[in-house]
Amino acid sequence: MKVRLLGCGTSTGVPRVGNDWGLCDPAEPKNRRSRVSILVENSAGARLLVDTSPDLRNQLLDGGIDRIDAVFWTHDHADHVHGIDDLRVLRYGRAAPIPGYAADETARRLRLRFGYAFAGHDDYPTILSLEPLEPLRMCEIGRAHV
């Protein structure tokens, strides 16, 4: 199994807008960090994306990632979900929407804020489906057991 941190910065990223580095040394290139998203890939090649940060487009491009099998959202804060629109291009060429997983309250809030992504409209296909999760129970996401 491979776990790739696509972003590991704070909710504002590092540096913050205004070139505020906080306690981070701007001379250290590793201190320039985008917001949190994680890609987990199992030995069968199934890819699970954890969270969709606002920096997701650049993270996918930088990582050469052109396919995911499922998405899991840890919670609905903006720094973990506002990259959801960048999943649209990953939906193209798929027979079905990308499966998405979240706790009940997070799923409810995602539907409220990004209803178009789960329902589709006009010329846009449905991007994502929201699948139920049972707390503390194993489930299959993509081709991975989590």
Feature roles, as predicted:
Residues 1-145:
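Binuclear metal-dependent hydrolase catalytic cores
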